[in-house]
């Protein structure tokens, strides 16, 4: 624990705390080879936080929380995890889902921070995803802030079936939005990036593939697999990661997290950390007594949140 606290403090003290305007700075994102690039074609790394499931922690889906994450935590990207499973999910209650998602998306646009619209599911719902992302592309496709994550974490799907799904959903998005980046999940909880490397999608531009890691569970093996994919010119985006075990709970492994972040920085991979929520688990960053909006004092930020906030302040500073 002493070493963990030392790491947190060193991150917090390593740099200035001034926020930047990432969209004003980088503009329309594009993918060149394995690299996410800015409007000028220069490499860019996005770093930020994922909100928890909208249907479990809706109180954090508000414009002031977005403002806090951008201005106080130095996030350059925020992920809005729209739940497709569990009670009150988007399929059961789309009106409630959009009451949560819309303020976050529009606050991100106003704050000039990138926003990931995440279809947070573990099962395929092709028709529903096409309809949703078609609507999102029509409404928000004109904004360079928007990134579409079309499938959070496939579990049982083969890469062959995921390619078919992605082709249909991306095709629907591209009817209305030819440019904004699309994130595609890969098999087995976004672990099997090697299958993507052997047979990537064809016929689309500005597409990236997601890898998810939890530092106390995933180590050298997945890091090696990810690096090998990048060396094969596969553009990787870590749209969800945790400093804990894969369950979202358990021990915090700051040393493994440092290795992951070092690899991401070296390879130019963007990374997002899970989650802004108040669940009784170690990857949840806030205590239940934290306000819905922030700013959040240190006494309501849990150890994982302090570690993530410190890393963001260290790396997202110009």
Residue ranges and their predicted role:
Residues 4-13:
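Sec-dependent N-terminal signal peptides
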Residues 12-13, 89, 250:
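Alpha-helical transmembrane segments and their juxtamembrane interfaces
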Residues 23-29, 53, 58, 76, ...:
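Extracellular glycoside hydrolase catalytic/binding regions
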Residues 80-85, 119-122, 241, 276:
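Active-site loop/turn elements of alpha/beta-hydrolase fold enzymes
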Residues 93-117, 121-126, 136, 140:
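Metal-dependent enolase-superfamily TIM-barrel catalytic cores that perform enediolate-based chemistry
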């Amino acid at each position: 624990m002493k070493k963990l606290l030392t790491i947190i403090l060193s991150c917090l003290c390593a740099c200035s705390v001034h926020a930047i305007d990432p969209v004003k700075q980088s503009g329309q994102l594009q993918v060149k080879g394995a690299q996410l690039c800015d409007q000028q074609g220069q490499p860019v790394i996005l770093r930020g936080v994922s909100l928890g499931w909208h249907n479990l922690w809706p109180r954090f889906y508000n414009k002031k929380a977005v403002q806090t994450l951008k201005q106080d935590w130095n996030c350059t990207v925020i992920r809005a995890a729209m739940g497709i499973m569990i009670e009150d999910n988007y399929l059961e209650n789309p009106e409630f889902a959009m009451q949560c998602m819309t303020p976050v998306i529009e606050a991100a646009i106003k704050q000039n921070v990138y926003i990931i619209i995440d279809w947070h599911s573990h099962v395929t719902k092709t028709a529903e995803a096409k309809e949703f992302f078609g609507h999102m592309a029509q409404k928000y496709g004109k904004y360079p802030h928007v990134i579409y994550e079309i499938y959070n974490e496939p579990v049982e799907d083969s890469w062959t079936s995921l390619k078919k799904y992605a082709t249909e959903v991306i095709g629907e998005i591209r009817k209305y939005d030819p440019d904004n980046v699309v994130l595609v999940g890969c098999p087995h909880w976004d672990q099997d990036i090697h299958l993507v490397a052997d047979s990537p999608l064809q016929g689309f531009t500005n597409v990236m593939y997601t890898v998810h890691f939890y530092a106390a569970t995933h180590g050298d093996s997945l890091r090696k697999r990810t690096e090998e994919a990048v060396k094969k010119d596969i553009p990787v985006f870590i749209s969800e990661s945790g400093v804990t075990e894969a369950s979202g709970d358990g021990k915090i492994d700051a040393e493994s997290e440092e290795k992951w972040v070092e690899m991401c920085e070296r390879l130019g991979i963007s990374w997002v950390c899970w989650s802004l929520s108040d669940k009784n688990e170690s990857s949840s960053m806030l205590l239940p007594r934290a306000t819905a909006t922030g700013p959040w004092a240190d006494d309501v930020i849990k150890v994982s949140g302090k570690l993530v906030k410190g890393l963001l302040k260290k790396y997202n500073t110009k």
